[in-house]
Amino acid sequence: MCPLRSLLLISTLVLLHHLPHLSLGRSLPTTTASPGRSCLDYSQNLLRAVSNTLQKARQTLEFYSCTSEEIDHEDITKDKTSTVEACLPLELATNESCLASRETSFITNGHCLASGKTSFMTTLCLRSIYEDLKMYHVEFQAMNAKLLMDPKRQIFLDQNMLAAIAELMQALNFDSETVPQKPSLKELDFYKTKVKLCILLHAFRIRAVTIDRMMSYLSSS
């Protein structure tokens, strides 16, 4: 029989992957920083930061159709990463009958796992999360550069969110092997940029929830 925790995790990941209309909900409790912060700490910090940024955008851009019901949902990681599939619990990813299978250990440079050793599937999961973060970080930085040129100076990206992305990427500590990403925004249209900001923030919050769930699962394994 499949472990209940694994089944709950995969159900959550699939739900987040297919249901983009998630509400912001209540703010998460503040995580106390410590010298040896784990990736779970960083993922919780990221989720708080993107939730706060999205909430601010919805308030500031209330006339830009910035709610989850109004936007056209888009996933910039589609066909580029496979985080939901890569982050399946090992017993579900490698054996349909959910029987325990042998794990091959790999040494990782990051400090997401205390031992420094992790299975091949977990390494794939963490690398996919890293690539997701990298893509969103590049996109948000390019978008913020354009927003800074807006004469109205209506909204800018919260530097706390950009810092939270960078911190988790640094904690994961993977060398990216993907082709350098080019931001999708090409024209200097501030209205379209703000609409795109809403779309990306909604998508990124969903991904941040998925990442936080996965880090929670790994930290308790």
Curated annotation (Swiss-Prot):
It comes from Bos taurus (Bovine). This is Interleukin-12 subunit alpha. Disulfide bonds join C39-C112, C66-C198, C87-C125. GO terms for cellular component: extracellular space; interleukin-12 complex. GO terms for molecular function: cytokine activity; growth factor activity; interleukin-12 receptor binding. The keyword Ribosomal protein does not apply. Heterodimerizes with IL12B to form the IL-12 cytokine or with EBI3/IL27B to form the IL-35 cytokine. IL-12 is primarily produced by professional antigen-presenting cells (APCs) such as B-cells and dendritic cells (DCs) as well as macrophages and granulocytes and regulates T-cell and natural killer-cell responses, induces the production of interferon-gamma (IFN-gamma), favors the differentiation of T-helper 1 (Th1) cells and is an important link between innate resistance and adaptive immunity. It is found in: Secreted. Its main location: secreted. Glycans are attached at N95.
